[in-house]
Amino acid sequence: MKSKLRVGLVCGGCSLEHEVSLKSAIYIMKYINKRFFEVVVLWISKQGDWYIVENDDMHIDFFVNKENLHKCMPILMFSSGNRCFEYINNILSLDVIFPIIHGALGEDGSLQGLLRLMNLPYVGSDVLGSAICMDKDITKRLLRDSGLSITPFRTFLAHEKKKLKFLNFADMFGLPFFVKPVNQGSSIGVAKVNDDYSFHSALDIAFFYSHKIIIESCIAGRELECAVLGNNENPITSVCGEIIKKNDDFYTYCDKYVDHNSEIVIPAVLEKSVSSKIRSIAIRVFQILNCFGMARVDIFLFGKDRIIINEVNTLPGFTSDSMYLKLWQATGINISTLLTRLIMLALDRYYKYN
């Protein structure tokens, strides 16, 4: 009988989405097909230190208690000032890596570059696709230049902050409009602007998270999402889902992970022609941005059939509340099958291009 594939599940990380990453990893551990895969959990602490965590310890309470660190096997230590490569053979003997670190350094191409240097197959987009989709400015430019509709926006760097005037953007975009850091996920650092005070507060917040921000118009359309699965040449799409907010605000981090202050409708109530158009555009977006493995394409539906691309997430959440998983479940692919497909796609890409 063929031995199981050893999967390195990389979680945690230094980003603001550390806890979400842990929840995703725990959920993956629960549903991955253990007949086919042996999982080795590689946890990156908030300080950037790497540890191997025993599978039995994979629960949130374990990571909250710092006294549990002694139970973990150190692999690569940075916070102490030493760069110690102990137990590195445990990494090199892995068959494939499943990175589930959300946000900065995890889905922006940084971790993907490290894995490429180590010559390891890994789930999800490559360095280029990850970096593109993490930068809202670059994503929008590429989609716009490819003829797709995007939300009107302007980009600014930190040194330009003092020249930014509320009235200029109120005239340009109308009210309200959004201020966003270019490189954060889960709506972190995003603010809706209605007046001069909220504008300057939004600038402070956005520039705290990034040296580059975008200011964009607020689209009063239906908020829809479509999941994509596959490698660049043959992706498939899920049914569409809709996020219906219970208030007039945008879909915040708390809505997604804390308060659940929105209604999710899957499949979204759409005319068949509109649904097909959205799914076709999602595939085109996936290919234009050089995505591999998976992505979630977020769009606005304006009027009957005007589709505007909002954002693309190359490493969506894998928790019980995650839209990506719910979309595939409604399409007929359960999480266990989805995880297996993602791992096989990673191996297929690796052996095809290496």
Curated annotation (Swiss-Prot):
Domain ATP-grasp as annotated: residue spans: 140-344
GO cellular component, one term: cytosol
Catalysed transformations (reactions): 2 D-alanine + ATP = D-alanyl-D-alanine + ADP + phosphate + H(+)
Location in or out of the cell: Cytoplasm
Cofactor needs: Mg(2+); Mn(2+)
Keyword ATP-binding part of the UniProt annotation: yes
Pathway named in the protein's UniProt entry: Cell wall biogenesis; peptidoglycan biosynthesis
Keyword ATP-binding belongs to the record: yes
Protein name (Swiss-Prot/TrEMBL): D-alanine--D-alanine ligase
Species name: Blochmanniella floridana
Taxonomic path: Bacteria, Pseudomonadati, Pseudomonadota, Gammaproteobacteria, Enterobacterales
